[in-house]
Amino acid sequence: MPTQNSHDNGLLAAAEDNIKNLSRRNFLGYIGGASALLLTAAACKKSDTPSTSKGVDLGSKDTGILNYAYALEQIEAAFYTKVFESPYAGITAAESARLGDIRDHEISHREFFKNALGTSAIISLTLDFSTINFGTRDGVLSTAKAFEDLGVSAYNGAGHLLASADYLLLAGKIVSVEARHAAYIRDLIAPGSFADGLDMNGLEMSRTPIEVLAIAASYIKNKINASNLPTS
């Protein structure tokens, strides 16, 4: 784990001010402020700023994995925001409340990574949801299920690629929230179907960054360059 110097301490103070603007109830409440500040201090290094010469370069090492997570959180946050621009026909008050909570969680995740990465963060992606039917319950919930499952499998598949124990702890806490989202969406579609997200060994699905980005590419107009991400 990197040692903290005076520069890092300054970053911690600045990060605390930035993160106060995020939703503590929805995010910092379950990941812990101290870990969040450590993430900010270690990640905000100008030398790690991704290049855009060959598409949106996620970067390398832990910064690359954090940008990978940030890209996925951008998709999820934008999707749930779009859901509430014109809620599907027949949405109940209970569904609206719970989906609204998920939206707020995803926005908090997105803004957390953006603030934590600082100058190393990738750009805001241009997304394309034209293939999604936002007007029907089935269209929204089936897509929500797909996105939540993708997010869970992404965090599960990338955890071992992180060198920092602090980052790994954060990823584990975030994926637990994503898994709860996935379970709730499944229960909306078919009560009691939460186990559908497990593999034959009873474990949650896992995908590599390349596998995840191949699926996510359908909704991203930007070219994503993941060539510098760690693979082991």
Where would I find each of the regions flagged by the language model?
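All-alpha RGS (Regulator of G-protein Signaling) helical domain and cognate RGS-like helical scaffolds
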Residues: 2-18, 31-33, 46-232
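N-terminal export signals
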Residues: 26-45
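Twin-arginine (Tat) signal peptide motif
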Residues: 21-25
